[in-house]
């Protein structure tokens, strides 16, 4: 759980070894990192996250952890499992799809952009 705490509730809000971002995002990153009220709210969320053990979680659920065929779906890589708040895993998975959605203009041509973004939204 400590890795998850750091990656979600702590390290995004200051310069940390694991943080990497596109240079063009520097103004947005600086704004978020200097927002004291945002940091306070995140700390309230951290307290809720660490004190709520209502279900067993995967702990690192993202699109790379979901293996699908036409007939079945398997979830892999459970090594970060822990007890936590019920909505955490699905929230992480949805956020992974949303990050992919918003990053697509930097990765796709106009011809394929809208179709792929629509597909991502249809998954959610």
Regions found by a protein language model. Name each.
Residues 1-11, 72, 87-91, 120-124:
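Internal hydrophobic scaffold segments of catalytic domains
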Residues 1-58, 69:
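ATP-dependent phospho-/nucleotidyl transfer catalytic cores
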Residues 50, 54, 86, 116:
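Aromatic-acidic/polar surface patches that form glycan- and anion
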Residues 56, 74-77:
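Pre-DFG segment of protein kinase catalytic domains
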Residues 60, 65, 77:
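Conserved catalytic-loop position in the HRD/HxD motif
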Residues 66, 83-85:
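Conserved protein kinase catalytic core
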Residues 73, 81-83:
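Activation segment
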Residues 87-124:
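Active-site activation/catalytic loop segments of kinase-like enzymes and analogous catalytic loops
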């Amino acid at each position: 759980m400590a890795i998850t705490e750091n990656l979600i509730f702590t390290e995004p809000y200051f310069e940390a070894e694991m943080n990497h971002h596109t240079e063009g995002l520097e103004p947005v990153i600086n704004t978020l990192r200097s927002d004291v009220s945002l940091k306070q709210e995140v700390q309230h969320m951290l307290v809720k996250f660490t004190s709520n053990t209502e279900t067993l979680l995967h702990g690192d659920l993202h699109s790379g952890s979901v293996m699908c065929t036409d007939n079945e779906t398997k979830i892999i890589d459970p090594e970060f499992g822990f007890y936590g708040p019920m909505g955490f895993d699905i929230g992480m998975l949805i956020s992974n799809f949303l990050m992919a959605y918003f990053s697509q203009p930097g990765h796709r041509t106009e011809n394929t952009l809208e179709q792929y973004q629509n597909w991502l939204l249809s998954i959610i």
